[in-house]
Amino acid sequence: MLGYEVVIGFETHAQLSTQSKIFSRAATAFGAEPNTQACAVDLALPGTLPVMNRGAVERAIQFALAIGAQVSPRSIFARKNYFYPDLPKGYQISQFEIPVVVGGEVEFYLDGEKRSVRLVRAHLEEDAGKSLHEDYVGQTGIDLNRAGTPLLEIVTEPDMRSSLEAVAYAKELHKIVTWIGICDGNMQEGSFRCDANVSVRKPGAPLGTRREVKNLNSFKFMQQAIDYEVRWQIEQLEDGHAIEQATVLFDPDSGETRSMRSKEDAADYRYFPDPDLPPLVIADDWVQRVRAEMTELPRVMAQRFVADYGLSDYDATALTQSHAIAAYFQAAAKACGQAKLASNWIMGDVARRLNTDEIDIAQSPVNAAQLGLLITRIVDGTLSNNAAKQVLDALWAGESPDVDAVIESKGLKQMNDSGALEKIVDDVLAANPKNIEQYKAGNSKALNALVGQIMKGSQGKANPQQVNDLLRKKLD
């Protein structure tokens, strides 16, 4: 953009899918009445002590294994000191110097090209409560239900260079945490919160001053916010103004970012080890137990699809976007024995209909077995591709659950009578001598015109390949 390079890093808070909080037994369910899920520990009453939730630690280990990161054998909890009304203790329990997860990377595709973003760390911490402003005129309500909810904060290197790349990374990260079941990924409920650190610089120059963009509760808003912030920073620099480090909020209504506060550095939080919590020690046998219990990872499943089904890397990655898509593909491929065709139909015609209806594949009106039979009818010559799409339309609309019944009722069965087809071909050739002359003169489009006439004469039931073969046999 105007000779500037965009530099983006992400901090993502993934709410871990435990039933109780990270340091107490209080429930983590979303939507309860305010302050009904906050116990003495969450309220920071005198004499209470935090007790580590084993499930939160195991989910952090799962994440490390999923991204090829190192699990720290010994990590430390620290107090992050700041004052806010919805933080009863006056500090947040987090990790600073030694996090539970170190390194790793997230790989994804953008425009068919494989990309990767390196991770710095992922650390465990507790969430704060919520300040409620809308229902209180001139006052602020405090809801501590969320206080103490376990979070995994995932921090990247500043490896992304566009809003498109940033969104592709965020979608892949979202896929990973939901696939392995450590987070439900609900962005509207705040289970998956992304903050983008955005800066710009001239190519080859040192990193510019970053501004942290918050309130990115959808992938659409994420792209809009980053694009606006990049334009704003470039305009400021072009006008001779310096960029000041700050935290900004994205307003979806105006499509603009506005400053919330000056951005703090680590020193402002005065981190120090929490004396109430011992070091978190994770033995290798614990890591191996977690590994043994984990589901097949999406990248491993994608590699299997390439090896077993002969799919491309791109197709295999697309079909492992969720457990539901992968299961649907495998069931359809098994039903028809044609994995590549199943892949093409799912990524093409089925995906288009899902997008139009704004539903996911688990809600598809056409199940994998039906799609598999439909593909079988193409392979065995019963249906042409165009006729198969008409059958899919009928199945999707709920006209009948039976593939063969739809084919019969709509008269879509492909013409396999070679004698009848040859008569249609002869009739078309007799009626179109000009096209024959043009074809023999080297005009290949003339052959297409003849094919079209024959398909029309057969009411679309002729096999296009048979038609082409028969025409060439008669004309060449």
Swiss-Prot record:
**Transmembrane regions listed in the UniProt entry:** none
InterPro entries per the record? Asn/Gln-tRNA_amidoTrfase_suB/E, Asn/Gln-tRNA_Trfase_suB/E_cat, Asn/Gln_amidotransferase, Asn/Gln_tRNA_amidoTrase-B-like, GatB, GatB_C_1, GatB_Yqey_C_2, Gln-tRNA_amidoTrfase_suB_CS
Enzyme Commission number, as recorded: 6.3.5.-
Gene3D superfamilies, per the entry: 1.10.10.410, GatB domain, N-terminal subdomain
State the UniProt keywords alphabetically.
Answer: ATP-binding, Ligase, Nucleotide-binding, Protein biosynthesis
A Pfam family of the record is GatB_N
Q: What is catalyzed by this enzyme? A: L-glutamyl-tRNA(Gln) + L-glutamine + ATP + H2O = L-glutaminyl-tRNA(Gln) + L-glutamate + ADP + phosphate + H(+); L-aspartyl-tRNA(Asn) + L-glutamine + ATP + H2O = L-asparaginyl-tRNA(Asn) + L-glutamate + ADP + phosphate + 2 H(+)
Provide the GO MF annotations for this entry. asparaginyl-tRNA synthase (glutamine-hydrolyzing) activity; ATP binding; glutaminyl-tRNA synthase (glutamine-hydrolyzing) activity
GO biological process terms held by the UniProt record = glutaminyl-tRNAGln biosynthesis via transamidation; translation
Which proteins does it associate with, and in what oligomeric form?
A: Heterotrimer of A, B and C subunits.
Family, as annotated: Belongs to the GatB/GatE family. GatB subfamily.
Its job? Allows the formation of correctly charged Asn-tRNA(Asn) or Gln-tRNA(Gln) through the transamidation of misacylated Asp-tRNA(Asn) or Glu-tRNA(Gln) in organisms which lack either or both of asparaginyl-tRNA or glutaminyl-tRNA synthetases. The reaction takes place in the presence of glutamine and ATP through an activated phospho-Asp-tRNA(Asn) or phospho-Glu-tRNA(Gln).
In terms of HAMAP family, this protein maps to:
GatB
What protein does this entry describe?
Answer: Aspartyl/glutamyl-tRNA(Asn/Gln) amidotransferase subunit B
Per the UniProt record, the lineage of the source organism begins with:
Bacteria, Pseudomonadati, Pseudomonadota, Betaproteobacteria, Burkholderiales
